[in-house]
Curated annotation (Swiss-Prot), chain A:
Keywords: Apoptosis, Endoplasmic reticulum, Membrane, Transmembrane, Transmembrane helix. One of its GO terms (biological process) is protein N-linked glycosylation. The lineage of its organism: Eukaryota, Viridiplantae, Streptophyta, Embryophyta, Tracheophyta. Residues 53-55 are lumenal. Pathway: Protein modification; protein glycosylation. This is Dolichyl-diphosphooligosaccharide--protein glycosyltransferase subunit DAD1. Residues 1-31, 77-94 are cytoplasmic. It comes from Citrus unshiu (Satsuma mandarin). It is a multi-pass membrane protein. Belongs to the DAD/OST2 family. It is found in: Endoplasmic reticulum membrane.
Length: 115, 427
């Protein structure tokens, strides 16, 4: 049984990789951006676990900037993806403009909360 | 006319000089009232009184039941110190009684009380008010069959040669009643105690039950320094001050050393110097505090300030103020309990200073110096100073602990900028 689950996992992983290779470059760039944001958030959480949460507002501000960035990037990816039937009629420029505006508001709030 | 004017100015300018007695600038007593049972004491104790007058004291001798004596008139004290050489007085004359003597001491004046083997209840009461208790048996004297002084006419071993203290050339002769001190009393001190072979009993009658006062619990000479720095000397032997004892030689029974002169004169001279504030008197002046690096005294400090506290302490040498040198004067920064306790360092010229950091607590603090040492007047200085917390713009602007968060926020902004460029201009 273990061998078959091992083989199944490997097969799954291979199919995932080949399917992912077929995605357009634009989306891959967005995925990279999201990964960078989440990675930065993880670094901050580990740092807080070591040092303690003393300037808690700064910690929240830093983590939320990463999380907010990731969330907005994911929204952009959803709206820009041509295979997504829900947003078929939305022009990608409109999606990008929303993305930029929301990021501006996010960074304004983050700078205020950073202390 | 000019001569008259000259004499007048001279006379008026000398008046303040006559009144400079027992002031804070010159703490030695000047005018001393000596109450005696009869004036024969003046001549039989002339050596002791002579030593006092030669040091500048103005002695006034009065009989203890003289109806004209009084310690104060119109609310002002006439004398700086009182000497009671009247062990058998039943009632003081004039306006003196136990309460007025206690008030006299309470106002900071000094007292010497000498009892003897026929001490009256009044003298015992005065001593009890001062904190020592004479033996209740009215006929008891201190007897010591081992440490007695060999003499020609005494056969009952009541003349004691005591050398239970340091730095005397010869033993001190004592003949009289003993007293005991309450061990809980921290103000009273035994100067000369009887040896462990002494006891207090009637020498003329047989002992029916064991004596209540024995051994070194018997104190022969005690001093009391009150909290207002008034000093009291209490002893149970008036003859200790007499010329006869001053001049006689001493030979302790059982030892072959024969001292030419007893240690009475030296001992009593030194202890009178202490009682009348010629020695062991301290004053602390010039309390200053300021921030390190500044020189004027601020009205308020902030937490975590560095400050410096300084004080000058002088000791009276009998004629002038000398710098007091010691390494155990401490200052407290006190609010309900001492937050900082620091030993002051001295420059050997009487100037003491210490530097410390204001604690991380705000409130109203006091700089307190509480200095009580054996034989010296107690110093109790206190200066109040408030301490405030940080103002809102006195905190650190950027916290080093939060640098990663600052970094991540800015890196997100940079990443967003780069990403928009890449996203827009890639195919």
């Amino acid at each position: 049984m273990a061998r078959s689950t091992g083989k199944d996992a490997q097969a799954l992983f291979h199919s995932l990789r080949s399917a992912y290779a077929a995605t357009p470059t634009t989306l891959k760039i967005i995925d990279l951006y999201v990964g960078f944001a989440v990675f930065t958030a993880l670094i901050q959480v580990v740092y807080m676990a070591i040092v303690g949460s003393f300037p808690f507002n700064s910690f929240l501000s830093g983590v939320l900037s990463c999380v907010g960035t990731a969330v907005l990037a994911v929204c952009l990816r959803i709206q820009v993806n041509k295979d997504n039937k829900e947003f078929k009629d939305l022009p990608p420029e409109r999606a990008f403009a929303d993305f930029v505006l929301c990021n501006l508001v996010l960074h304004l709030v983050i700078m205020n909360f950073l202390g | 006319m000019a001569k008259l004017l000259l004499y007048l100015t001279l006379a008026t300018s000398l008046i303040p000089l006559f009144s400079v007695a027992f002031s804070p600038e010159n703490p030695t007593d000047r005018r001393v009232l000596v109450l005696v049972d009869d004036f024969a004491i003046k001549s039989s104790h002339s050596l002791y009184f002579g030593s006092l007058t030669s040091r500048g004291f103005q002695l006034e001798f009065k009989l203890a039941d003289d109806p004209n004596i009084g310690l104060q008139r119109y609310g002002q004290y006439l004398y700086d110190a009182l000497v009671l050489f009247c062990p058998s007085v039943e009632r003081f004359g004039g306006s003196i009684d136990v309460a007025s003597i206690v008030d006299f001491v309470d106002s900071g004046h000094d007292l010497i009380v000498a009892a003897d083997s026929n001490a009256s209840d009044l003298i015992r009461e005065v001593a009890t008010e001062c904190g020592v208790d004479f033996d209740e048996d009215p006929a008891a004297m201190v007897i010591d069959h081992i440490n007695y002084a060999v003499s020609n006419f005494d056969g009952d071993h009541t003349l004691i040669a005591s050398d239970d203290f340091i730095k005397a050339d010869a033993p001190v002769l004592f003949q009289g009643i003993g007293h005991s001190l309450n061990p809980a009393n921290s103000l009273v001190l035994k100067v000369l105690s009887a040896s462990s072979s002494a006891y207090s009993a009637n020498p003329k009658s047989k002992l029916s039950n064991p004596p209540s006062l024995t051994g070194s619990a018997i104190s022969l000479v005690s001093v009391v320094q009150a909290r207002n720095n008034a000093r009291i000397l209490i002893t149970g032997s008036l003859s200790m001050f007499s010329n006869r004892f001053f001049r006689s030689g001493v030979q302790k029974a059982g030892s072959s050393i024969k001292h030419e002169k007893s240690g009475n004169e030296q001992f009593l001279t030194e202890i009178s110097k202490w009682v009348f504030h010629e020695r062991g008197h301290l004053k602390a002046v010039n309390v200053r505090h300021h921030k390190v690096g500044e020189s004027d005294e601020p009205a308020i400090y902030r937490i975590n300030d560095d400050l410096e506290y300084s004080v000058e302490i002088y000791e009276w040498s009998g004629t002038s103020w000398e710098p007091y040198v010691s390494d155990d004067v401490q200052v407290q920064f006190y609010m309900m309990s001492p937050y900082v306790l620091k030993t002051l360092s001295t420059d050997q010229k009487g100037h003491y200073s210490a530097e410390f950091k204001v604690p991380d607590v705000y409130g109203v603090f006091q700089f307190k110096v509480e200095y009580q040492r054996l034989g010296y007047t107690s110093l109790s200085l206190s200066k109040q100073i408030p301490v405030r917390p940080y103002r809102h713009n006195e905190y650190e602007r950027f916290l080093p602990a939060a640098y990663p968060y600052y970094g991540s926020a800015f890196s997100m902004m940079a990443g967003f900028f780069i990403f928009t460029i890449v996203h827009l201009y890639s195919k």
